[in-house]
């Protein structure tokens, strides 16, 4: 889990501030594709939203050869979702 700059999320008729980003590898074929599931939580770790991301191509090559693939994946996922890690 990573802290993010607050993002407004509409949930069940109210606006909440997501401040936590979690990214989980759901599948990696270890060749050219990785699927992630992401979650956004508020400060109380209440899940506000979830979704999926697919990492392929040059991004996958960089991810799979990175000495810190977890950090790369979080930064890549945050960029895809227009989130800012703190």
Question: Which stretches of residues belong to each language-model region?
Answer:
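Acidic, low-complexity intrinsically disordered segments
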Residues: 2-4, 9, 48-86
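Compositionally biased, intrinsically disordered low-complexity regions enriched in proline and serine
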Residues: 12, 17, 22, 39-42, ...
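A short, structured beta-strand/loop element
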Residues: 30-59
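Negatively charged, low-complexity tracts enriched in Asp/Glu with abundant Ser/Thr
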Residues: 1-28
